[in-house]
Amino acid sequence: MPNYSGSWNLVQQMQAVAASNWPVVLAPGTVGIFALGVVSGAASTTRNKYRFSDCSNASATAASAASYLGSAAGNSTVGIFALGNTGSASSTRDKYTYSGCVNGSATAASAASYLGSAAGNSIVGIFALGIVSSAASTTRDKYTYSGCTNVSATAASATSCGGSAAGNSTVGIFALGSAGTTRNKYTYSGCINAVATNASSASYYQSAAGNSTVSIFALGYINGVGASTTRDKYTFSGDTNATATSSSANSLGGSAASNGTTGVNV
């Protein structure tokens, strides 16, 4: 990637644009970056860029290492990808800048981990690390996009892995997974962790997405049942949980996104 620091005149800019070497500023909510994980039976570096306006899919800049079982959070400028398992648990994170499709190093996690989850707002991403040292953990990290700093966040109420998370600009709802119904409500201001209304069934290998009002949780693998179609609707106002419309097929280990500001459900 060329160095764009310093002063550029209009002719130089137009020459760079013509050569596809000038970064294009993307409006918030225009693209989603997908890390594919396992491809053809092996961990991959492959990422796709999905453009919402015309439902087009293109190659995105690859990850720094082949990986799977990671997590990601971001804002309208960058996405922070915790790579997860790169052959073993990893603390590596990548910073994907949407303008220019640039992949760079992000500040590492506090511990090597995988099977985590993440949610955040425009300022911070809260990463539940999942499996650390071969066991489910309560560890969470707070990643501040401005300055790319990583510090400890308030721990979960119980050890967990394979959960999911979604939220709005104020709180993140973390379904802890590990075949339990427990959910936590993480308030970004003050870094406060509290009990949230439980899921309708004990489950793990989940996914979640939402907007400023509700989050939809696909429960994934329900304890004693297996892969499921079950979804819950969590309403932030009142902290209520209700049944949501089921998925089209039994599934587990999926993923989800929604069309708020890129990377943030606002």
Please annotate each region the language model reported.
Residues 1-266:
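Polar, enzyme-active/binding microenvironments
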